[in-house]
Amino acid sequence: MTRIKRGSIARRRRAKTRLFASGARGAHSRLTRLIAQQTIRALASAHRDRDKKKRDFRRLWITRINGVIRQNVLSYSYSQLITNLKKEQLLLNRKMLAQIAISNRNCLSIIYSAIIILETKEEGQK
């Protein structure tokens, strides 16, 4: 049986990882061991930050909604709005509410004033 040299296969594998780390600075884009380490770190960071991005956007949406609500009505807060939305079974998520808050503040004020009216009617019936 003939001997198979694996130099070309190893070179191809290293070239693939080199392409992945081509944007790194210094030795991290040139030396094979450092490229491997950098690749692992980059992929770990990407995985972690995909989840972090979701949390960051949720915080941003909540901040925007709360800011618009507190500008218009002093005694009303974000938590009260979300509680009342759930009670009335309105299917508006935080992303949609934040978009409404940015594009048309009057529309958001109409939504929470309608919720307040419904809430007072329910209290009057009890």
Curated annotation (Swiss-Prot):
| Cellular localization per UniProt | Plastid, Chloroplast
List the Gene Ontology MF annotations in alphabetical order: rRNA binding; structural constituent of ribosome
Whether Ribosomal protein counts among this entry's keywords is: yes
Family matches, as InterPro entries: Ribosomal_bL20, RIBOSOMAL_L20_CS, Ribosomal_protein_bL20_C
Give GO terms for biological process: ribosomal large subunit assembly; translation
Q: Provide the Gene Ontology terms for cellular component.
A: chloroplast; ribonucleoprotein complex; ribosome
What is the top-level taxon of the source organism? Eukaryota
Q: Which PANTHER family match?
A: 39S RIBOSOMAL PROTEIN L20
Annotated HAMAP family: Ribosomal_bL20
The record describes the protein's role as: Binds directly to 23S ribosomal RNA and is necessary for the in vitro assembly process of the 50S ribosomal subunit. It is not involved in the protein synthesizing functions of that subunit.
The entry's family comment says: Belongs to the bacterial ribosomal protein bL20 family.
Spell out the protein name for this chain: Large ribosomal subunit protein bL20c
Name its species: Pelargonium hortorum (Common geranium)
Encoding gene (name): rpl20
